[in-house]
A protein has these predicted regions:
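Transmembrane-helix signature of 12-pass secondary carriers
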Residues: 1-452
Length: 452
């Protein structure tokens, strides 16, 4: 069987997969990398500023969790709505729209006068952040050649770690500098507006999405343009390419996208993939955000570190967990497969959680490393579980479950800490991670090297 016939996007998808890596691929990855950095900045900075806000607004532990979870509530809705929308109006438009929504409300949150205002603005900013995840993952996976997709998507996820380091640095210098320093930290989220003209100029619409919508002429023109830029000339004449693409591409009538498409996620062909993606996102999000976002408070309140020392320790952990986990798991997933790599990350995260409780100190670095590797694998694996016409909807649906987990995790952990301390938090994490490993074994399909 030819590559074109095996590729769900037909000959145009096969031509994309056949392209050697070029400057254009790196530009695409860099723009999406900036997007994930900018749109995750707000998710990270509030917990870092929280020790000061607690003192100024006299917040109780449960209210701390509520405020930390605010953007996650917006993430749940944003992932669902914008995930569906990206399959209806396209990846590029939603990329721009989510960036604007996030940046505007992130800027406004810096001017919040009280708990209620900050909560509402954080929820609104979360709408944009939740919407970016489906479109960003779809963009990178749909333009990455199959043989490099694991590494490319994992590198895209490094933006989460890089921005964590930058957010910690900004918080270290700005938050203690003045009583209003935390406002400057939150307000820096407005820099996302600078990315909008870059997206408009640098990124084309997804070829695979266009093919799934039957817009073969536009898709063929983009592939010709990319081949001309990377190879020097198109590999096929336009008329012949369009004719062959029409013959090999799936019919747009073969499945619906948008609201009607959500039912297809639980049809006989996709239900296992959908349930698995939901479980993976819930486990990864709860255990990652539930622990990592509480790390500054654990270090300062549970372990007695002073504020500056707690920031430094958080910074070291973030540096260790930035870059190398995504690079290693991305390479491993292209070598030994997605399922095995994800399962290994989950198992190691559970083990080192208990090691951290017993030994403390720098064992937290291993904990952060494997949690970051697990988070990166959700970005690699999820887009490959869904067909082109439903990829945004599928990612949005699964990530909304993850965002719900990240919404309840800080509040749940606040209650668990009060009842069982740090050990209780890490024990619950270990149970959830064991469930994730079981789901990978029972429901997981290996997607390494598959055409999408």
């Amino acid at each position: 069987m030819s590559d074109a016939m095996k590729n769900p996007a037909g000959t145009l998808g096969a031509r994309l997969d056949a392209l050697p890596l070029g400057t254009w691929h790196k530009t695409l990855l860099f723009v999406c990398f900036l997007g994930v950095m900018i749109e995750n900045y707000s998710q990270i900075t509030l917990p870092l500023a929280m020790p000061v806000i607690i003192g100024q607004w006299h917040l109780k532990p449960f209210m701390i969790g509520v405020l930390i979870s605010a953007s996650s509530l917006g993430l749940v809705v944003g992932a669902l709505v914008f995930g569906i929308l990206t399959d209806i109006i396209g990846r590029k438009r939603v990329f721009i729209l989510t960036t604007v929504v996030y940046s505007v409300f992130a800027a406004l949150s810096a001017f919040a006068a009280d708990f209620t205002q900050l909560y509402v603005l954080r929820v609104a900013a979360g709408l944009g952040l939740g919407g970016f995840v489906p479109v960003g993952m779809a963009f990178v996976s749909e333009f990455s050649p199959a043989r490099y997709r694991g590494r490319f998507t994992a590198i895209f996820s490094i933006g989460n770690g890089v921005v964590y380091v930058l957010a910690v640095l900004a918080s270290m210098f700005l938050v203690p500098a003045s009583p209003e320093g935390w406002r400057w930290v939150l307000g820096l989220g407005a820099l996302g507006l600078l990315l909008v003209p870059v997206i408009a100029a640098a990124l084309p619409e997804s070829v695979r999405w266009l093919v799934s919508r039957g817009e073969i002429d536009r898709a063929a023109a983009i592939v010709d343009q990319l081949e001309r830029r990377i190879l020097g000339a198109p590999t096929m004449e336009r008329a012949a390419a369009i004719a062959e693409a029409r013959a090999s591409a799936p019919s747009p009538a073969g499945g619906r996208s948008g609201l009607a498409g959500t039912r297809a996620l639980f049809g006989k062909d996709l239900w296992k993939h959908t349930i698995l993606a939901m479980i993976v996102w819930f486990v990864a999000s709860y255990t990652f955000y539930g622990f990592i976002l509480w790390m500054p408070s654990f270090l300062t309140q549970q372990m007695g570190y002073e504020l500056t020392k707690g920031y430094w320790f958080t910074l070291v952990a973030a540096l260790v967990g930035t870059g190398t986990p995504a690079l290693v798991v991305g390479y491993a997933s292209d070598r030994i497969g997605r399922r095995r790599t994800m399962s290994l990350c989950m198992a190691a995260y559970a083990v080192f959680g208990l090691v951290f409780y017993w030994l403390g100190g720098y064992s937290i670095l291993f904990l952060y490393w494997f949690s970051s590797g697990m988070a990166s694998m959700t970005y690699v694996y999820t887009p490959e579980l869904f067909p082109n016409r439903l990829r945004g909807t599928g990612i949005g649906f699964a990530s909304s479950v993850g965002r719900f987990a990240s919404f309840i995790a800080p509040m749940a952990i606040g209650l668990i800490v009060a009842a069982g301390g740090l050990f209780g938090v890490l024990a619950v994490n270990a149970v959830l991670l064991a469930g994730g490993i079981a789901a990978m074994r029972l429901l997981g399909a290996e997607t390494k090297g598959a055409g999408i």
